[in-house]
Amino acid sequence: MARALALSRSVQVCKSRLFTVASKSAITKRCLSNPIQYRSVSLFATTYAPSKDLNSRLHSEHIGDTALYLLLNPGLTSSVLFRADILAQSGKCPTLAALEAQKQQETEEASTATAMTMAQNVIEEEKEVKEPVVEIPAREVPGFELHKTLIRRLIPRNQQLDMPVDQTCHLYSHAGAVEQIEKEKELGIPHSRAPKERFMVIYTPHVSSKEELPYYHPLVRSMAFVYEFGYTGEFEGPENSIPRIAENPKGTMSIHFLPYENDVDSISARLERSLTKLIEVQIRTTKGRLDPCRPSTSSPYALIKDNVIPRNRVQDTYSRLKNKYAANLNERWIESTEPSKHVFEDLSIAAFLIELWRDLYGAVPGDEREQQKQQSSTSKVGSGQFPGFVDIACGNGVLVYILISEGYSGWGFDARRRKTWSIFPTDVQERLKEEIYIPKPFMDVLAAQNQGPIQNKNQDASMQSPLSEPQSGQSNGPNSGTSTSTSLSNLPKDTFIISNHADELTLWTPILSTLLNPANPPPFLAIPCCSHSLSGARHRFRPQSARPSATQNPQKQQGENGTHSQDEEGSSEDMKERKGEEKEKNPETGDLEQMRKDKLAAQNPH
């Protein structure tokens, strides 16, 4: 039997830091001169050493919901982790995993039948046979009842550095007499004791020694998260009178852990810091979900963000792309900007697009397609007709390079050639064009003003890029065969448009999609950055404000005789005059010549 830890030395060293964490959580305010109280709680046959307790007034039901959410999303407590895959579960109560599966099913049902069929075929043929996972037996804890058992696999971000680890999570609950006391209070029946309810989760990794534990996991054999919630009895009258139940309940949150035999005499600063952070994240997340100022977080659905593509697929593809391309791109980067920001951002976008195209078209990366051909000559995986892509304002071209290297045909263009283009293979450089795209509506106006077609290298029709006939499973982009001229307006009608930080062309992205195929516009992906208007000028769009109701300000809405007041009319006229003056001072047409004149006039007022 392991003995309780002697925490006095660690407490004296880390006293101020522990109090800082408590103040951040805003759970209790204790004077710094007061000593930190620790207690050893023996809930099991083995004595567990507890961390610092924090007083809280959060209901155990809310704590339990948050514990389930953090159990499925360990990345909130450790930046090293991606996610947790649920391998097995048992119990009666629904979990957030079930809610997530239900939400994903609703999203799939809303998609088209063709896309669903392709996605289902791909997913079914990609399923791997998983090894059976043995569940660690649950402990019998006095006063607690086993509520649910989950077996999860912690997936790290860098699996070449950290290994995944399986973990059995036992969820216990103890309602106590709180519900009964509440009913008795409504009926006016006196009470003789202060009730409590408790919630507990025990995490046990599937390892035989601490050497098998990865870096991100605390060096403990097992860990128990305990939350006790109840009412404090306050006596009134004689000594033997019935206690009055306080209106404000109190909760106590603590973490108990079972150390290894060689670590029972001390607690490392890293372990103490990790356990304290677990409590802090638990409280902060629970309070955030219950914050009335953020009603959207009160629903479990609001916490689920991967409604388009399942998170595990995007993360696995991102890890594969990062291991394949990140090091090489960072080493060969020749731009003056920081490579890590651009490289990893484009890798994540590429991972999302690859999984999106898998569902939309049934197209898979080239390596995966070759593996499927070797395994089965009759396999249909990856045989979907991919229409090709175009990356407008492609910038450094990293996204185009990754997608082409993964076997997806397409091309990109930008107004200025970038240094990064030179580090790519020749076939990729041929698909990166230095062009300026002027939308067709503007070219029609210019052509009408000049009474004839304009021969200018900056016009839409000048973007000549030969296309070849699509091959089986793919379609080729520009510069891959014949010399047929094309432009953005003459691209294949199903071309997928990528608008990644396209600035002036961001608003034009859905319009370009509609111009390609008005009857059935192709899908596109727009990731906005700087805000511009359709004219190309910088413009910040203000959010639409809700109109005040007539019951809130009736005097401003209507005068005594049923007409608008004179003050309102005067203010509206003044507003129109001010807007007219601002319009004259600040041209919004994108006229560079006029803007330059205004700038020179401001610099030389005399």
Curated annotation (Swiss-Prot):
Region Disordered, annotated ranges: 455-489, 537-606
Encoding gene (name): trm44
Signal peptide: none
Keyword terms of this UniProt record: Cytoplasm, Methyltransferase, S-adenosyl-L-methionine, Transferase, tRNA processing
EC number(s) recorded for this UniProt protein: 2.1.1.211
Function recorded in the entry: Probable adenosyl-L-methionine (AdoMet)-dependent tRNA (uracil-O(2)-)-methyltransferase.
Enzyme class: transferase
Family per record: Belongs to the TRM44 family.
Protein name in UniProt: tRNA (uracil-O(2)-)-methyltransferase
A GO MF term: tRNA (uridine) methyltransferase activity
Organism of derivation: Emericella nidulans (strain FGSC A4 / ATCC 38163 / CBS 112.46 / NRRL 194 / M139) (Aspergillus nidulans)
Compartment list: Cytoplasm
Ranges of compositional bias, category Basic and acidic residues: 573-600
Biased composition range(s): Low complexity: 470-489
